UniProtKB/Swiss-Prot annotation:
Name this protein carries in UniProt: DNA ligase
Lineage, broadest ranks: Bacteria, Bacillati, Mycoplasmatota, Mollicutes, Mycoplasmataceae
GO molecular function: DNA ligase (NAD+) activity; metal ion binding
Enzyme Commission code(s) on record: 6.5.1.2
Gene3D superfamilies, alphabetized: 5' to 3' exonuclease, C-terminal subdomain, BRCT domain, DNA ligase/mRNA capping enzyme, Helix hairpin bin, Nucleic acid-binding proteins
Keywords associated with the record: DNA damage, DNA repair, DNA replication, Ligase, Magnesium, Manganese, Metal-binding, NAD, Zinc
Listed cofactors: Mg(2+); Mn(2+)
GO cellular component: cytosol
Function: DNA ligase that catalyzes the formation of phosphodiester linkages between 5'-phosphoryl and 3'-hydroxyl groups in double-stranded DNA using NAD as a coenzyme and as the energy source for the reaction. It is essential for DNA replication and repair of damaged DNA.
Binding site for NAD(+): D34, T35, E36, Y37, D38, S83, L84, E114, R137, E171, K286, K310
Residue intervals of the BRCT domain: 588-668
Length: 668
C-alpha cells in the first residue's frame, strides 16, 4: 500500500474503533465481539508502529498507556471546581428548597437528581474537537494535570464533533468488580490492599506509569458541560448535550418536577445503593433552570443552587474478636478492633479504630462481645456500643496495656491527656512511622518512597533515620538485589529523593514531625521566620505572639530544638543540600493592610485563593466570619448575609478594584 492508502486505512480503523468503543463503554450496547475489536486495534497499532508520523492524540491506540511521567504539572481551572453543601435527611432538603424558593417564588422547583459517585472529580478540556487537558479538582482552583492517564480511560472520548472550546466535568471511579480484581491481584503479589474503590481510583489516576492506569479499567460518568456558545443550557439539557457528543452519563439521572418525585428518588436509591456496581455516597440535586442558578449564585465555597443529600450512616452488628494496640510516629498508642467480617456500605469491614483506652472504657467494650458498628460515606468505621445481653457480663473487662506493643517500654500518660505514649526514642515502629511521615505527600513528597518500600528498606537496615534517605546511592547494589526492585525503580527513587531537596521550608518543617505542628502551622512558621536558623533562635515569648500558636505548641518547638540529636539531624540534612529556606512570596510587613483582618464574600472575577494569597503576602489576616475584629469585607457579586452583618458592625466594605487600590496605597 502507498502512504496515502496507509493513512486512509488508519483513519478508517480509528473511526471504526472509536464508534465501537462508544457503543461498548458509553451506550452499553456493543455491536461486535471482543475478538473483532482486538484484531482491529492490533492492526491499527501495527500500522502506527510502521508509520509513527500518523499517530494522533485521538487514536484509540493511545488508550493503552505507556508514557511515564516524572511529575504532575498544575492546571488552573478557568471556572473554580467548588464543593457542595450537605443535607442528611429529607427535612433538611426541604429547608434548602425553602431558601431556593425565596428567589424562585415556587416551592416545586425542578431539580436534576444525580447519583453522587464515590470517585474523584475531573475536568476535561477539548479544543478543536480534541482532548487537550484533564485535571483533578485539587484545591478547587488549581488541580493536577493527569491528561496522559485520563487518555487511557475507555469511556472518555479523545475526540468529539464540537470544534469550539468545551469543558466537561464528571467523576472518575472504579467499579466494584474491577476493585475486587485489582485487590485479588495485589493479594497474590503480597502488596497492600486498597481500602475502597475510591482510594483505588485516586491512587490509580496518580500513577506515574500510564500502562498501570490502562490495566485497571477506570471508568467515568460526566455530568457538567461548559461552553461559551451555550452559556444558558439548563442542567438537564447539559446532560443531553453530553450524550449527544458521545460522553457517558449516568442513566439513573432524573429530572424531578416536584417534591414528591424527589422523595421517591431518595427512597429508591437509599434502598438500591448497595446493588449498584459502583459506590455512591449520596444524591446530588441541582436546580435545572440556568437562569435560577445564576440568580441564586454562590457562597465562597459552594453553589447555592445545588446540594448533596448524604445517605444516613449504616449500622450493623458483628463480633469484637480482639482489641490490639499500635504505636504511631509520636509514640501515641492507638487501640483498634479486630472484627468478624461484615459487609457495610459496599465494603467488607474487619477492623475499626477504638482511639484510646478511655474510649473503650467509656463504652465498656469487651473482647468476644457483640458490637454495633457504624459507617458513613468514606469515614472510618466506628464501634458505637456493645450489646449487653445475658452473656456480656461473663466476658472479661478490658484493661489498658502498660507496655509498648512494639518495643515493650513502659508507657506514659499525662494527667490531662487521654492518650498513652511510648517515650522510647529507639522504638523501631516510632522510627518507621516517622520516616513514612517525612516522605509522605504532605511533607517531603518523595513519590517513589512509599510506605511499603520504606518498610522493606528499614527492615534491611538500609534506612534507620531521616538522613539515611539521602544516602541511598551508597546502597545501589543492595537495593537492586531486592525482589521486584529493578534499575528503573531505583532511578525513580533517587530522582524523587533529589527533587525533595528543593522543597520549601514548610514541607521539611512538617516532615520533621515536631509535636503539634501540622501542615498549616508549618507554613505560618515558615512565612514568619523565612529559614530554619531564625526559627531555632525564636523565644517562647516571641512564638506565642504569633496568631494560632498557643503555649503547648510554643513549648514543643522550643523543646524540640533543645535536643542534641535533632540539631545533629538538621546539620546532616544541610550537608545533603536540603533547602531550609521559605520559597514562597515574602511578607510585606510594611503594607497598609498589615495586621488587618479580611472577610471575603460573593463571586469574584479571580480565584478566591489569589486574593487570600495577596492578603497573606501583605501581612493581612483572613477570617471566615464577620465580627467586631473584622477590618474589611471584600465583596464580589451575589453576596449573602455577611454584607448585612458587616454594615451593622460598621465594617469597611470594598470591591475588587478598591482592594487593589488599597494595596497600592502607602501607610499614612
Amino acid at each position: 500500500m502507498s502512504k496515502e492508502q496507509i493513512l486512509l486505512r488508519i483513519n478508517q480503523l480509528k473511526e471504526q474503533l472509536n464508534l465501537w468503543s462508544k457503543q461498548y463503554y458509553v451506550d452499553d450496547n456493543p455491536s461486535v465481539d471482543d475478538t473483532e475489536y482486538d484484531l482491529a486495534l492490533k492492526e491499527l497499532i501495527s500500522l502506527e508502529n510502521l508509520y509513527p508520523e500518523f499517530i494522533t492524540s485521538d487514536s484509540p491506540s493511545q488508550k493503552v498507556g505507556g508514557t511515564v511521567s516524572e511529575k504532575f504539572l498544575k492546571i488552573t481551572h478557568k471556572t473554580p471546581m467548588l464543593s457542595l453543601g450537605n443535607v442528611f435527611n429529607f427535612d433538611e432538603f426541604l429547608e434548602f428548597n425553602t431558601q431556593v424558593s425565596k428567589v424562585s417564588n415556587n416551592l416545586n422547583n425542578e431539580y436534576v437528581a444525580e447519583l453522587k459517585i464515590d470517585g474523584l472529580s475531573i475536568s476535561l478540556v477539548y479544543e478543536n474537537g480534541v482532548l487537550v487537558s484533564a485535571a483533578t479538582r485539587g484545591n478547587g482552583v488549581i488541580g493536577e494535570d493527569v491528561t496522559t492517564n485520563v487518555r487511557t480511560i475507555k469511556s472518555i472520548p479523545l475526540k468529539i464533533s464540537k470544534k469550539e472550546r468545551v469543558e466537561v466535568r464528571g467523576e472518575i471511579y472504579l467499579s466494584k468488580a474491577e476493585f475486587e480484581k485489582i485487590n485479588q491481584k495485589r493479594l497474590l503479589n503480597n502488596e497492600d490492599l486498597f481500602i475502597n474503590p475510591r482510594n483505588a481510583a485516586a491512587g490509580t489516576l496518580r500513577q506515574l506509569d500510564s500502562k498501570i492506569v490502562a490495566s485497571r479499567n477506570l471508568d467515568a460518568f460526566l455530568y457538567y458541560y461548559i461552553s461559551d456558545d451555550s452559556p444558558n443550557l439548563n442542567q438537564y439539557e447539559s446532560i443531553l448535550k453530553l450524550n449527544q457528543l458521545g460522553f457517558k452519563t449516568n442513566k439513573e439521572t432524573m429530572l424531578c418536577k416536584n417534591l414528591d418525585q424527589i422523595k421517591a428518588y431518595i427512597d429508591k436509591y437509599t434502598n438500591l445503593k448497595n446493588d449498584l456496581d459502583y459506590q455512591i455516597d449520596g444524591i446530588v440535586f441541582k436546580i435545572n433552570d440556568k437562569n435560577l442558578q445564576n440568580s441564586l449564585g454562590f457562597t465562597s465555597k459552594i453553589p447555592k443552587w445545588a446540594i448533596a443529600y448524604k445517605f444516613p450512616a449504616e449500622i450493623k452488628q458483628t463480633k469484637l474478636l480482639d482489641i490490639f494496640a499500635t504505636v504511631g510516629r509520636t509514640g501515641k498508642i492507638t487501640y483498634n478492633a479486630k472484627l468478624e467480617p461484615v459487609f457495610l456500605m459496599g465494603a467488607t469491614i474487619s477492623a475499626a479504630t477504638l482511639n484510646n483506652a478511655e474510649y473503650i472504657k467509656s463504652k465498656d467494650l469487651r473482647i468476644n462481645s457483640i458490637v454495633k458498628i457504624k459507617k458513613a460515606g468514606d469515614v472510618i468505621p466506628e464501634v458505637i456500643e456493645a450489646i449487653k445481653d445475658e452473656t456480656f457480663y461473663n466476658l472479661e473487662v478490658f484493661q489498658p496495656i502498660l507496655y509498648c506493643p512494639n518495643c515493650h517500654s513502659l508507657l506514659e500518660k499525662n494527667e490531662n491527656e487521654v492518650d498513652q505514649f511510648c517515650i522510647n526514642s529507639s522504638c523501631s515502629m516510632k522510627i518507621l512511622r516517622s520516616l513514612q511521615h517525612f516522605s509522605s505527600r504532605e511533607a517531603m513528597n518523595i513519590v517513589s518512597l512509599g510506605d511499603r518500600s520504606l518498610e522493606i528498606l528499614f527492615n534491611l537496615e538500609i534506612i534507620q533515620n531521616i538522613s539515611d534517605i539521602y544516602k541511598l546511592e551508597e546502597y545501589k547494589d543492595q537495593i537492586l538485589a531486592i525482589e521486584n526492585f529493578g534499575l528503573k525503580s531505583y532511578l525513580n527513587l533517587i530522582d524523587s529523593i533529589n527533587m525533595s531537596k528543593n522543597n520549601s521550608l514548610e514541607k521539611v518543617l512538617f516532615g520533621l514531625g515536631i509535636r503539634h505542628i501540622g501542615s498549616k502551622t508549618a507554613k505560618i512558621l515558615a512565612r514568619k521566620y523565612q529559614n530554619i536558623d531564625n526559627l531555632m533562635k525564636a523565644s517562647y515569648d516571641e512564638l506565642i505572639q504569633i496568631n494560632s500558636i498557643g503555649e503547648s505548641l510554643a513549648l514543643s518547638i522550643i523543646d524540640w530544638f533543645k535536643i542534641e540529636d535533632n540539631l545533629k539531624l538538621i546539620n546532616e540534612l544541610k550537608s545533603f543540600n536540603i533547602n531550609f529556606n521559605y520559597l514562597g512570596a515574602k511578607i510585606n510587613s510594611d503594607s497598609i493592610i498589615a495586621n488587618k483582618t479580611f472577610v471575603i464574600t460573593g463571586t469574584l472575577t479571580r480565584p478566591r485563593e489569589e486574593f487570600k494569597t495577596l492578603i497573606e503576602n501583605n501581612a493581612g489576616k483572613i477570617s471566615g466570619s464577620i465580627s467586631k475584629q473584622t477590618d474589611y469585607l471584600l465583596a464580589g457579586n451575589n453576596v449573602g448575609s455577611k454584607l448585612e452583618k458587616a454594615k451593622k458592625l460598621g465594617v469597611i466594605i470594598i470591591d475588587e478594584q478598591q482592594f487593589f487600590d488599597l494595596l497600592k496605597s502607602e501607610k499614612g
